[in-house]
C-alpha cells in the first residue's frame, strides 16, 4: 500500500497519479489496490517514479496553495504573527520548481527570533523563503499595495 500512501500524502487522485507517471489509469488502480503486485518490479518502479516526481525540496517540486496555508498557520500563530500574505509566483499560480515562497508578515520580531521564524518556515515547506516584515516597508510603499491587492491572505 506504499503507492496509495504516497498518492494520499500529496493529495492526488488515482487518475492524477497515473498521468504523472505515464501509465494507464486502470493499470494504476489495479497496482494500487492489490497487494499481489507489491513485490513486482513494475510496482517498485511506480513507487520510485511517483516519489521522485512529487519530491519537494528547494529545487524540486511545486507546493500546493492549500499545503502552504495548512503548514504556515500553526507556525505563524506560535510566533504571534497578526497577519501574513503570500505574494509572488506562488500567489500568482505560476511558481516553478525553483521558486521561493514570498511572504509579508506583520510581526514585531527581530534578530534571532526573526531568523528562527524564517528557518522554521523553510524547514516546514522545504523551500527557500523570502520573508518581509511590514514594519520594514515605508507606509504607502507600492509593494505593500500590490501585495495586499494581489497576494493571498494566509492568516
Give the positions of each predicted feature.
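Short beta-strand-loop elements within alpha/beta enzyme cores
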Residues: 99
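Catalytic core of pol beta-like nucleotidyltransferases
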Residues: 1-83, 92-96, 108-155
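Short helix-loop-helix/strand-helix junction enriched in hydrophobic and basic residues
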Residues: 88-90
